[in-house]
């Protein structure tokens, strides 16, 4: 029983370390590109966006342990629901502020 727990712990620790290494690399890369100015600003924006999206995916996979297994379908449905609610709140607030600005002018 204890060897099973040690194997599972090592697998989990390896997952956390890989996630930490990937996320720290994807954090330092945009800082390096912004400081050193290797590319023009448009290319930097695209690289920043790709790093941010890939870092979100890495956090979901390595730290939240989301997968596409049939047993974990509810986790993905919950994540989709949270993303929809955040989208409604953020863009609804922007829409309301735009209309308030338009009505006061």
Curated annotation (Swiss-Prot):
Keyword Transmembrane belongs to the record: yes
Keywords recorded for this protein, A-Z: Cell membrane, Electron transport, Membrane, Oxidoreductase, Transmembrane, Transmembrane helix, Transport
MF (Gene Ontology): cytochrome bo3 ubiquinol oxidase activity; proton transmembrane transporter activity
Record topology, Extracellular segments: 36-45, 97-105
Topology term for the membrane: Multi-pass membrane protein
Single GO BP term: aerobic electron transport chain
Cytoplasmic side: 1-14, 67-75
Subcellular location: Cell membrane
Any GO CC annotation of this UniProt entry: cytochrome o ubiquinol oxidase complex
Keyword Transferase: no
Source domain of life: Bacteria
Positions of transmembrane segments: 15-35, 46-66, 76-96
Cited Pfam families: COX4_pro (PF03626)
Subunit structure: Heterooctamer of two A chains, two B chains, two C chains and two D chains.
The family this protein is said to belong to: Belongs to the cytochrome c oxidase bacterial subunit 4 family.
Record's function text: Cytochrome bo(3) ubiquinol terminal oxidase is the component of the aerobic respiratory chain of E.coli that predominates when cells are grown at high aeration. Has proton pump activity across the membrane in addition to electron transfer, pumping 2 protons/electron.
Protein name: Cytochrome bo(3) ubiquinol oxidase subunit 4
Organism: Buchnera aphidicola subsp. Acyrthosiphon pisum (strain APS) (Acyrthosiphon pisum symbiotic bacterium)
UniProt lineage: Bacteria, Pseudomonadati, Pseudomonadota, Gammaproteobacteria, Enterobacterales
Gene that specifies this protein: cyoD
């Amino acid at each position: 029983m204890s060897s099973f727990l040690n194997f599972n712990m090592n697998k989990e620790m390896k997952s956390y370390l890989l996630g930490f290494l990937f996320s720290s690399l994807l954090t330092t890369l945009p800082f390096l590109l912004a400081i050193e100015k290797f590319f023009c600003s448009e290319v930097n924006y695209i690289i920043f966006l790709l790093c941010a999206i890939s870092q979100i995916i890495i956090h979901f996979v390595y730290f939240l342990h989301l997968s596409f297994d049939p047993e974990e379908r509810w986790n993905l449905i919950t994540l989709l629901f949270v993303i929809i609610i955040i989208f409604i709140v953020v863009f609804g607030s922007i829409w309301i502020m735009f209309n308030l600005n338009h009505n006061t002018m």
